[in-house]
Curated annotation (Swiss-Prot):
Signal sequence annotation: 1-15
Family designation: Belongs to the calycin superfamily. Lipocalin family.
Keyword Disulfide bond annotated: yes
Tissues expressing the protein: Expressed in liver and in sublingual and submaxillary salivary glands. Highly concentrated in secretory fluid such as saliva and urine as well as in hair dandruff extract.
Protein name per UniProt: Major allergen Equ c 1
Post-translational modification note: Several N-terminal ends may be due to cleavage by signal peptidase at different sites or may be generated by proteolytic processing of the secreted protein. Analysis of the sugar composition shows the presence of GalNAc, Gal, NeuAc, GlcNAc, and Man. May be also O-glycosylated.
Entry keyword annotation includes NAD: no
Subcellular location: Secreted
The protein's assembly and partners: Homodimer.
Main location, first listed in the record: secreted
Length: 187
């Protein structure tokens, strides 16, 4: 277990150093996270995890900071073609800005600001029983973002080893908006 945590720490430190080299990416101020978010992109080095019926094909609705520094989030996903909701709690780790979660394996992730505090990227490393994989989730405060911001995200994840075929633009699919409490219609 100690070896796993050491490897994980090294992965996240390297990812953070890479992020710091990009002008567009910064550590996110967690005090600003509470509220509605929309899933814009999913990207992974294991595409089947984010394809239709993949375990990581989830759509964010709300994220809230909890008093104990953990995060609470509500997500939607499709199960047998039906939209369903489920909550998650992300536990704060000892490393600043890093959270963990048991979901389809053990996950550790960092939240980074992208362009401004209206856009965030979750960089997640999953240690499942089969093999580890990385996942990038791009969230925004609005249901869609400009083509320029989308292009920037694609460049960022490609620099981190994700091939274009493993990047899914979620704005072009049903993201289960009908379950959201705000009445947003799917485009």
């Amino acid at each position: 277990m100690k070896l796993l945590l050491l490897c994980l720490g090294l992965i996240l430190v390297c990812a953070q150093q890479e992020e710091n080299s990009d002008v567009a990416i910064r550590n996110f101020d967690i005090s600003k996270i509470s509220g509605e978010w929309y899933s814009i992109f999913l990207a992974s080095d294991v595409k089947e995890k984010i394809e239709e019926n993949g375990s990581m094909r989830v759509f964010v609705d709300v994220i809230r900071a909890l008093d104990n520094s953990s995060l609470y989030a509500e997500y939607q996903t499709k199960v047998n073609g039906e939209c369903t909701e489920f909550p998650m709690v992300f536990d704060k780790t000892e490393e600043d800005g890093v959270y963990s979660l048991n979901y389809d394996g053990y996950n550790v992730f960092r939240i980074s600001e992208f362009e401004n505090d209206e856009h965030i990227i979750l960089y997640l490393v999953n240690f499942d029983k089969d093999r580890p994989f990385q996942l990038f989730e791009f969230y925004a405060r609005e249901p869609d973002v400009s083509p320029e911001i989308k292009e920037e995200f694609v460049k960022i994840v490609q620099k981190r080893g994700i091939v274009k075929e493993n990047i899914i633009d979620l704005t072009k699919i049903d993201r289960c908006f009908q379950l959201r409490g705000n009445g947003v219609a799917q485009a």
